[in-house]
């Protein structure tokens, strides 16, 4: 069994990477990266279904050797990615500045044109499989073809062919981003980016290109967590055990059907046995009255119910460790909505998703720094990073009725500010936006009500609205007006 404990972070103590030391830094980094690459490749093949059970060998009755892959690794990654990235990541303006809000809307339009939602999904796939992923952003040379074209291009890199080298100083800043390709002639071509330089190096350690650049390091790492552990990496022994048990169950059924025959006190030749297998019957007699002849099957059937209990227990453990909901949970007439959410593990799934959000946002801010710089240099979009907030828009429908009741109760309490009600009811992914939209809607409704009232009573009096009231200027109504 392969022991996997997360990916290694690549460090260098070089203060500045130059033509004189870039090859040395690359060689040392590549040695560590190749270890990571071998593990990532193993995890990726495991995710696709190429798992150790397919290569098992049996010494006893090797002709009965079923290999069953229950690809729970694929299930774990698919759920995690779907739950985290089911809805596109959005950029939201901080504050009430309309100019900033319009610029952020334009930034979201840029991301839509670049199909960033699909590329975020690719990033999340690699993060949950390999424990880390990489994104690259470069200026788009054809960005002026259309006005709404994003001035930058976004790429999702294969973590088996890319890595980032960090410094050992305080904060471990990124020193160099590397991606490489295998050419048809078998040569490896490395593209190395530092903060102010670009190098192109072959695996013969010749620097083919060396030129200055002002963009910075366009390769950003998106680790899944600090240990860079994949989503199913920590339960690999359990997943292998489930495969083994399921394969052995099929072996047990097949061995029961193809049971061995026991000949007790029966003298049988090879030809007689072949005839038995072909005809399905045999004639024999006792050798001696005291030595009874007997032919029977050697059978020992596997207890399927106990085996299923073992499989269910291991699967439940996998779900608990990975923070996934149990879709086969029991039910009770006394369960409340909150109890079901807690019991079936949906609260744990949400907690893990929020943990992944924090790691994603940290790297996404580095990506935004480069993106906003490109948009400023090549376009007319001027935005500060501090004016943009990254929002995950997962649909928050769990226990929605109870949350709505809490919101109504808090809004009806005159001692609670409405903004606090929106923030703490748990109903909205972005309480501030929901509050602002609701306040604008309430003002619009008040304005419409005033306009409707003024149209119904253009003179501003109350007489026409009262039962039996008369129009102004007639009868007693006019007299009372004169007295006033």
Label the predicted regions.
Residues 121-229:
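Extended, regular secondary-structure scaffolds
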Residues 117-126, 249-257, 303-400, 411:
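C-terminal amphipathic alpha-helical
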Residues 1-150, 462, 478-484:
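Extended, helix-rich architectural segments
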Residues 11-22, 29, 140-144, 264-280, ...:
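Charge-rich, acidic-biased intrinsically disordered regions
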Residues 435-484:
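Extended, compositionally biased alpha-helical segments that mediate assembly or anchoring
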Residues 400-456:
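Charged substrate- and nucleic-acid-binding regions of tRNA-handling and nucleotidyl-transfer enzymes
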Residues 208-344, 348:
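Extended, charged amphipathic alpha-helical segments
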């Amino acid at each position: 069994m392969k022991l996997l404990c997360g990916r290694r972070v690549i460090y260098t103590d070089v203060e500045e990477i130059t033509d004189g030391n870039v090859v040395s830094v690359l060689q040392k980094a590549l040695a560590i990266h190749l270890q990571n690459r071998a593990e990532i490749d193993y995890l990726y093949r495991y995710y696709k279904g190429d798992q150790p059970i397919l290569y098992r060998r049996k010494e006893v009755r090797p002709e009965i050797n079923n290999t069953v892959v229950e690809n729970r690794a694929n299930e774990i990654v698919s759920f995690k990615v779907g739950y985290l990235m089911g809805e596109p990541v959005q950029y939201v303006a901080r504050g009430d500045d309309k100019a900033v809000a319009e610029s952020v809307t334009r930034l979201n339009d840029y991301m839509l044109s670049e199909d960033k939602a699909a590329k975020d999904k690719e990033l999340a796939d690699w993060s949950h499989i390999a424990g880390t992923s990489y994104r690259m952003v470069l200026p788009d040379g054809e960005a002026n073809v259309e006005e709404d074209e994003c001035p930058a291009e976004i790429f999702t890199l294969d973590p088996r062919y890319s890595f980032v080298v960090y410094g050992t100083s305080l904060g471990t800043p990124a020193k160099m981003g590397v991606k490489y390709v295998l050419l048809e002639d078998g040569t490896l071509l490395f593209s190395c980016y530092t903060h102010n330089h670009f190098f192109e190096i072959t695996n013969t350690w010749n620097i083919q290109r060396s030129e200055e650049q002002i963009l910075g390091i366009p390769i950003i790492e998106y680790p899944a967590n600090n240990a860079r552990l994949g989503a199913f990496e920590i339960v690999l022994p359990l997943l292998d055990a489930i495969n083994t048990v399921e394969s052995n169950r099929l072996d047990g059924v097949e061995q029961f059907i193809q049971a061995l025959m026991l000949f007790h006190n029966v003298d049988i030749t090879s030809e007689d046995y072949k005839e038995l297998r072909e005809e399905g019957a045999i004639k024999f007699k006792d050798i001696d009255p005291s030595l009874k002849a007997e032919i029977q099957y050697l059978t020992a059937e596997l207890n399927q119910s106990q085996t299923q209990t073992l499989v269910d227990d291991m699967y439940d453990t996998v779900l608990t460790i990975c923070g996934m909901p149990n879709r086969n949970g029991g039910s009770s007439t006394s369960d409340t909505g909150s109890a079901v959410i807690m019991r079936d593990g949906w609260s744990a799934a949400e907690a893990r998703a929020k943990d992944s959000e924090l790691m994603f946002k940290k790297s996404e801010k580095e990506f935004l720094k480069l993106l906003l710089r490109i948009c400023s240099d090549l376009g007319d979009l001027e935005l500060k990073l501090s004016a943009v907030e990254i929002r995950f828009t997962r649909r928050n429908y769990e226990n929605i009725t109870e949350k709505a009741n809490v919101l109504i109760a808090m809004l009806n309490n005159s001692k609670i500010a409405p903004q606090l009600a929106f923030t703490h009811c748990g109903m909205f992914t972005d309480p501030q936006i929901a509050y602002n939209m609701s306040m604008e809607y309430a003002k619009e409704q008040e304005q419409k009500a005033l306009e409707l009232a003024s149209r119904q009573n253009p003179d501003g009096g109350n007489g026409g609205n009262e039962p039996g009231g008369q129009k102004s200027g007639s009868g007693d109504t006019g007299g009372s007006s004169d007295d006033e």
